[in-house]
Regions:
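Catalytic zinc-binding patch centered on the HExxH motif and its immediate surroundings
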Residues: 37, 44-67, 76-78
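Hydrophobic (often cysteine-bearing) scaffold residues that line and stabilize catalytic clefts
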Residues: 17, 21-25, 83, 131, ...
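Active-site recognition of the HExxH zinc-binding catalytic motif
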Residues: 84-97, 139
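Post-HEXXH active-site segment of zinc metalloproteases
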Residues: 80, 96-131
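Long, well-structured alpha-helical subdomains associated
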Residues: 80, 121-202
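Zn2+-dependent metallopeptidase catalytic core
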Residues: 18-39
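A short, surface-exposed helix-loop junction/capping segment
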Residues: 1-16
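Surface-exposed helix-capping loop/turn segments at secondary-structure junctions
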Residues: 12, 34-41, 100-102, 150-158
Length: 202
Protein backbone atom coordinates (compact mmCIF):
# COMPACT_ATOMS: atom_id res chain seq x y z
CA UNK A 1 0.00 0.00 0.00
CA UNK A 2 2.88 2.34 0.76
CA UNK A 3 4.08 2.22 -2.86
CA UNK A 4 0.59 2.11 -4.39
CA UNK A 5 0.38 5.79 -5.33
CA UNK A 6 3.93 5.85 -6.67
CA UNK A 7 2.72 3.51 -9.40
CA UNK A 8 0.57 6.33 -10.80
CA UNK A 9 3.65 8.29 -11.84
CA UNK A 10 3.80 8.18 -15.62
CA UNK A 11 7.10 6.34 -15.99
CA UNK A 12 5.85 3.52 -13.76
CA UNK A 13 2.27 3.57 -15.04
CA UNK A 14 3.38 3.08 -18.63
CA UNK A 15 5.12 -0.14 -17.63
CA UNK A 16 2.03 -1.66 -16.03
CA UNK A 17 -0.28 -4.04 -17.88
CA UNK A 18 -4.00 -3.29 -17.95
CA UNK A 19 -4.49 -6.06 -15.40
CA UNK A 20 -2.01 -4.50 -12.98
CA UNK A 21 -3.52 -1.06 -13.50
CA UNK A 22 -6.92 -2.45 -12.58
CA UNK A 23 -5.42 -4.00 -9.44
CA UNK A 24 -4.17 -0.54 -8.52
CA UNK A 25 -7.70 0.80 -8.93
CA UNK A 26 -9.06 -1.95 -6.67
CA UNK A 27 -6.43 -1.17 -4.02
CA UNK A 28 -7.28 2.54 -4.13
CA UNK A 29 -10.98 1.80 -3.74
CA UNK A 30 -10.31 -0.43 -0.73
CA UNK A 31 -8.28 2.34 0.89
CA UNK A 32 -11.00 4.94 0.34
CA UNK A 33 -13.76 2.57 1.50
CA UNK A 34 -11.82 1.86 4.69
CA UNK A 35 -11.60 5.59 5.40
CA UNK A 36 -15.38 5.83 5.06
CA UNK A 37 -15.83 2.73 7.24
CA UNK A 38 -17.73 0.81 4.56
CA UNK A 39 -17.07 -2.49 2.81
CA UNK A 40 -15.08 -2.35 -0.45
CA UNK A 41 -17.20 -1.92 -3.56
CA UNK A 42 -16.72 -4.16 -6.57
CA UNK A 43 -15.16 -2.38 -9.56
CA UNK A 44 -16.15 -3.20 -13.12
CA UNK A 45 -15.05 -1.79 -16.46
CA UNK A 46 -17.43 -0.44 -19.08
CA UNK A 47 -16.09 -0.83 -22.62
CA UNK A 48 -18.97 1.02 -24.29
CA UNK A 49 -17.33 3.68 -26.48
CA UNK A 50 -20.50 5.79 -26.33
CA UNK A 51 -20.49 6.04 -22.53
CA UNK A 52 -19.59 9.66 -21.89
CA UNK A 53 -18.70 9.63 -18.20
CA UNK A 54 -15.79 8.24 -16.21
CA UNK A 55 -17.71 6.30 -13.60
CA UNK A 56 -20.95 5.53 -11.80
CA UNK A 57 -22.04 3.93 -8.53
CA UNK A 58 -25.08 1.69 -8.71
CA UNK A 59 -27.07 -0.77 -6.63
CA UNK A 60 -29.02 -3.61 -8.23
CA UNK A 61 -30.76 -6.37 -6.27
CA UNK A 62 -28.77 -5.29 -3.23
CA UNK A 63 -25.43 -5.63 -5.02
CA UNK A 64 -23.27 -2.52 -5.12
CA UNK A 65 -20.75 -1.79 -7.83
CA UNK A 66 -18.70 1.02 -9.29
CA UNK A 67 -18.58 1.04 -13.06
CA UNK A 68 -15.46 2.62 -14.55
CA UNK A 69 -14.92 3.75 -18.10
CA UNK A 70 -12.30 1.49 -19.71
CA UNK A 71 -10.50 4.59 -21.01
CA UNK A 72 -9.28 5.21 -17.46
CA UNK A 73 -7.09 2.14 -17.84
CA UNK A 74 -6.31 2.45 -21.52
CA UNK A 75 -5.27 6.12 -21.64
CA UNK A 76 -2.35 6.96 -19.30
CA UNK A 77 -3.34 10.64 -19.34
CA UNK A 78 -6.53 9.72 -17.46
CA UNK A 79 -4.92 7.85 -14.57
CA UNK A 80 -5.52 10.71 -12.13
CA UNK A 81 -9.09 11.04 -13.32
CA UNK A 82 -9.32 7.40 -12.27
CA UNK A 83 -8.21 8.33 -8.75
CA UNK A 84 -10.76 11.13 -8.59
CA UNK A 85 -13.54 8.95 -10.00
CA UNK A 86 -12.89 6.09 -7.58
CA UNK A 87 -12.86 8.49 -4.64
CA UNK A 88 -16.01 10.22 -5.91
CA UNK A 89 -18.02 7.05 -6.53
CA UNK A 90 -16.94 5.44 -3.25
CA UNK A 91 -18.22 8.55 -1.51
CA UNK A 92 -21.58 7.88 -3.16
CA UNK A 93 -21.44 4.36 -1.74
CA UNK A 94 -20.87 5.89 1.69
CA UNK A 95 -23.80 8.28 1.22
CA UNK A 96 -25.97 5.33 0.24
CA UNK A 97 -25.02 3.48 3.42
CA UNK A 98 -25.89 6.56 5.49
CA UNK A 99 -29.35 7.15 4.04
CA UNK A 100 -30.42 3.50 4.10
CA UNK A 101 -30.94 3.29 7.83
CA UNK A 102 -33.34 4.77 10.34
CA UNK A 103 -32.49 8.45 10.53
CA UNK A 104 -32.90 10.47 13.69
CA UNK A 105 -34.60 13.85 13.59
CA UNK A 106 -31.36 15.83 13.91
CA UNK A 107 -29.51 14.07 11.06
CA UNK A 108 -30.25 16.89 8.66
CA UNK A 109 -27.47 16.21 6.14
CA UNK A 110 -28.44 12.54 5.89
CA UNK A 111 -32.09 13.50 5.35
CA UNK A 112 -31.06 15.94 2.65
CA UNK A 113 -29.03 13.20 0.96
CA UNK A 114 -31.97 10.82 1.16
CA UNK A 115 -34.25 13.30 -0.58
CA UNK A 116 -31.57 13.79 -3.20
CA UNK A 117 -31.27 10.04 -3.85
CA UNK A 118 -35.04 9.98 -4.35
CA UNK A 119 -34.99 13.10 -6.55
CA UNK A 120 -31.67 12.70 -8.31
CA UNK A 121 -30.71 14.75 -11.37
CA UNK A 122 -28.57 12.70 -13.77
CA UNK A 123 -25.52 14.15 -15.50
CA UNK A 124 -27.11 13.38 -18.86
CA UNK A 125 -29.93 15.84 -18.11
CA UNK A 126 -29.65 19.25 -16.45
CA UNK A 127 -25.90 19.65 -15.84
CA UNK A 128 -26.40 22.66 -13.57
CA UNK A 129 -28.77 20.75 -11.29
CA UNK A 130 -26.51 17.72 -11.45
CA UNK A 131 -23.43 19.62 -10.27
CA UNK A 132 -25.27 21.56 -7.55
CA UNK A 133 -27.33 18.81 -5.91
CA UNK A 134 -26.15 17.94 -2.41
CA UNK A 135 -24.81 14.42 -2.95
CA UNK A 136 -22.77 15.52 -5.96
CA UNK A 137 -21.39 18.60 -4.20
CA UNK A 138 -20.38 16.41 -1.28
CA UNK A 139 -18.73 13.78 -3.51
CA UNK A 140 -16.93 16.45 -5.53
CA UNK A 141 -15.69 18.18 -2.39
CA UNK A 142 -14.38 14.91 -0.99
CA UNK A 143 -12.62 13.91 -4.19
CA UNK A 144 -10.89 17.32 -4.30
CA UNK A 145 -9.80 16.78 -0.70
CA UNK A 146 -8.51 13.33 -1.70
CA UNK A 147 -6.49 14.68 -4.62
CA UNK A 148 -5.02 17.49 -2.51
CA UNK A 149 -3.20 14.91 -0.39
CA UNK A 150 -1.07 14.00 -3.37
CA UNK A 151 -0.32 17.40 -4.90
CA UNK A 152 3.24 17.33 -3.60
CA UNK A 153 3.79 13.70 -4.61
CA UNK A 154 2.66 14.42 -8.16
CA UNK A 155 4.02 17.96 -8.40
CA UNK A 156 6.02 17.04 -11.52
CA UNK A 157 3.17 15.17 -13.19
CA UNK A 158 1.53 17.36 -15.83
CA UNK A 159 -1.53 15.10 -16.01
CA UNK A 160 -2.17 15.52 -12.29
CA UNK A 161 -2.24 19.31 -12.52
CA UNK A 162 -4.60 19.18 -15.50
CA UNK A 163 -6.87 16.73 -13.71
CA UNK A 164 -6.92 18.71 -10.47
CA UNK A 165 -7.61 21.99 -12.27
CA UNK A 166 -10.49 20.42 -14.20
CA UNK A 167 -12.05 18.84 -11.11
CA UNK A 168 -11.64 21.94 -8.95
CA UNK A 169 -12.82 24.19 -11.76
CA UNK A 170 -16.05 22.24 -12.14
CA UNK A 171 -16.70 22.49 -8.41
CA UNK A 172 -15.72 26.14 -8.15
CA UNK A 173 -17.84 27.39 -11.04
CA UNK A 174 -21.00 25.44 -10.15
CA UNK A 175 -22.09 28.05 -7.59
CA UNK A 176 -21.65 30.91 -10.05
CA UNK A 177 -23.67 29.17 -12.75
CA UNK A 178 -26.47 28.39 -10.30
CA UNK A 179 -26.50 31.97 -9.05
CA UNK A 180 -26.76 33.26 -12.61
CA UNK A 181 -29.79 31.08 -13.28
CA UNK A 182 -31.64 31.28 -9.97
CA UNK A 183 -30.38 34.46 -8.29
CA UNK A 184 -29.20 34.92 -4.71
CA UNK A 185 -31.58 32.27 -3.37
CA UNK A 186 -30.20 29.63 -5.73
CA UNK A 187 -29.48 27.05 -3.00
CA UNK A 188 -33.07 27.16 -1.78
CA UNK A 189 -34.41 26.89 -5.33
CA UNK A 190 -32.16 23.94 -6.14
CA UNK A 191 -33.33 22.15 -3.01
CA UNK A 192 -36.93 22.97 -3.95
CA UNK A 193 -36.41 21.29 -7.34
CA UNK A 194 -34.99 18.21 -5.62
CA UNK A 195 -37.90 18.05 -3.17
CA UNK A 196 -40.36 18.30 -6.05
CA UNK A 197 -38.67 15.52 -8.01
CA UNK A 198 -38.42 13.38 -4.88
CA UNK A 199 -42.18 13.66 -4.33
CA UNK A 200 -42.85 12.82 -7.98
CA UNK A 201 -40.72 9.68 -7.74
CA UNK A 202 -42.40 8.40 -4.59
Amino acid sequence: MFFLFSKFKLKKWNKLSYEKRFKCFVAVEKKVAKEFNISPIKLELNYDENWNCYGAFSVSSGKKRILLNSRLIEDPRLRFHALETISHETRHAYQFSVVNKDLRWFEFTAKKWKRNWQGYFAASGDSLMYNNQSIERDAQKNSIKFLKRYRWKYRNEKDFKETFDAVFGRYDTADDKARQRYGIFYKWKIERNIRKKSRENN
